[in-house]
Amino acid sequence: MTEPAPTRIYVDADACPVKDEIYKVAERHGLPVSVVAGAFIRVPAHPLIERIAAGSGMDAADDWIAERVQPGDIVVTADVPLASRCVKAGAEVLAPNGKPFSEASIGMTLAVRNLMTDLRSSGEVTGGPRAFSPRDRSTFLAALDTTIRRIARRRASPPAQQQN
């Protein structure tokens, strides 16, 4: 039996406000990070951090992540359609505010996102999400650490005892 690949953290980086926090947590746990953006993005020079310029096409960064993510990986994104694709692939997915996307919640989250997009385009709703706060940052850090530990426990337990 082969060992599963180590957990990798994929970051949908174009508008991610918690990249620095991800780098610190990943370094502490020794996890590789793929920082994926449509174009060049600055990342720290560190052997665990990989910068990916996926291209300028529509959803190029999303496609790059979705095509590579595996069960046991972590994806950080605010993009609900990308989150849906990654959850279906078996990855753990967190929004930058720490909110987890799961199989149980992704359908409703996607439906609400589509409804709000339609309402905004018709002019019935204006504005967007509230501003990112220090509390969001703290919640994200706790959620990322909890997710990493949960994956590590799952991988360490014998297959007959594994549970989600």
Swiss-Prot record:
Pfam families, per database record: DUF188 (PF02639)
InterPro entries referenced in this protein's UniProt entry, alphabetically: UPF0178
UniProt superkingdom: Bacteria
HAMAP family: UPF0178
PANTHER family the record matches: UPF0178 PROTEIN YAII (PTHR35146:SF1)
Family listed: Belongs to the UPF0178 family.
Name of protein: UPF0178 protein RPD_2254
Organism listed in the record: Rhodopseudomonas palustris (strain BisB5)
Record lineage: Bacteria, Pseudomonadati, Pseudomonadota, Alphaproteobacteria, Hyphomicrobiales
